[in-house]
Amino acid sequence: KSLPGNAEIYRPENVAPVENSPLSGMNLCFLGSSVTEGAASLETSFAEYIAVRNNCTYVKEAVGGTTLADNDKTSYIQRMLHNIDPNAQFDAFICQLSTNDASNAIPLGEISSSRNLEDFDTKTVLGALEYIIVYADTTWHCPVVFYTGTQYDSPAYGKMVEQLLKIENIAKINAFAEVFR
């Protein structure tokens, strides 16, 4: 709480909106773990800033310490299936590439050529990624965007980012990972 970046001046309600933002009026969905949650910033993350600065509405489904891989009821997949309204109208689905999968040594898996949900091995990182992409695309019919974490010195996470960029070309999604290369 006493971190300088958590000062009142930086709270979303104290940030000026962007005039004529192309995001104005959009409804965004954020799925992730601690970064999306805002764990070190009083539960306020970039999602709140994007919404306030750009006159957006949003849904934020974020729980710290969780994984993409479907290994328990708090996984990204389970929370996406059970906590996000499948009838919602989203303009974009934005998902965090979790470092927790790398930290927990979740198997990377293989990229599939399928677009059938039942074909993905969701116990692996890549199977979970592909499941999330296909489910979001077929449920909300909106662009699917992934973002990577800050610099994280992990060979396993580096491989996850590399594979995400391969999936990006196959699945026609957007991955914001180039910043850290």
Model-predicted segments: where are they?
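Cysteine protease catalytic core and zymogen-processing segment of caspase-like enzymes
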Residues: 117-129
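Short hydrophobic segments within beta-strands
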Residues: 31-32, 147
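Extracellular serine-dependent O-acyl
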Residues: 143-148, 154-181
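Short, conserved loop/helix-junction motifs that constitute active-site signature segments
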Residues: 21-23, 87-88, 137-140
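Alpha-helical structural signal in soluble globular domains
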Residues: 49-53, 135, 139, 160-168
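Membrane/wall-proximal cationic-aromatic binding patches
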Residues: 3-30
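Conserved SGNH/GDSL esterase-like catalytic core that processes O-acyl groups on lipids
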Residues: 24-29, 35-119
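Generic structural signal for well-ordered alpha-helices
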Residues: 129-133, 158
